[in-house]
Amino acid sequence: MDLLIKTLDGNEVGKLKVSESVFGLVPREDILQRVVRWQLARRQQGTHQSQGRSDVSRTGAKMFKQKGTGRARHSSARAPQFRGGGKAHGPVVRSHAHTLPKKIRALGLRFALSAKLKADDLIVVDEFNVKDAKTRMLVSCFSKLGFDNALLIGGNEVDLNFSRATSNIPNIDILPIQGINVYDILRRSKLVLSKAAVEVLEERFK
């Protein structure tokens, strides 16, 4: 299958042949959901914690004598049933990350690429290079191309001027090809790949 290559001015400059096994799959939502959940779980800080009965600042002395009061027997005032006591089974500092097979992760990325192409939301641009880091010029180019909410994926290195010019445009993200991931692809309506990025993806999944 062939993909059209455009310039930032919107002109067509050729076609790029890509494999069906990377860009032509039928997307599976269950795989995409698994990969996104895996990514977001790894991103969670897991620093939540509440004070248990051993953490609260309160006396550990027996509240009142065992017998003779007619009341239920109690020991520590730190017990969770009392006001000011510790939390029972509260959150603790932990990692929320879980494992996901490498093949499933790779498959999820291919499904995400295929889903964008199937929805006509994948565009290939010859290169992400500008002479000056001028945001106004790129905003004009993006509006012509319909990039109002897009993820841009460059080659192994992203042009510094281009990166600076896009940094303060809302709803536009730019990443090098090493940073491509399912979550960022799906959270933006358009996926814009440089020609170099497509070649790297083809080589990776060959």
UniProtKB/Swiss-Prot annotation:
Subunit-structure text: Part of the 50S ribosomal subunit.
Magnesium among keywords: no
InterPro entries tied to this protein: Ribosomal_uL4, Ribosomal_uL4-like, Ribosomal_uL4_dom_sf
Biased composition (Polar residues): 42-54
Function (record text): One of the primary rRNA binding proteins, this protein initially binds near the 5'-end of the 23S rRNA. It is important during the early stages of 50S assembly. It makes multiple contacts with different domains of the 23S rRNA in the assembled 50S subunit and ribosome. Forms part of the polypeptide exit tunnel.
Family statement: Belongs to the universal ribosomal protein uL4 family.
Protein name: Large ribosomal subunit protein uL4
Region spans: Disordered: 42-93
GO molecular function: rRNA binding; structural constituent of ribosome
Extent of Basic residues compositional bias: 64-76
GO biological process: translation
One GO location term (cellular component): ribonucleoprotein complex
Keyword RNA-binding assigned: yes
Pfam families: Ribosomal_L4 (PF00573)
Keywords: Ribonucleoprotein, Ribosomal protein, RNA-binding, rRNA-binding
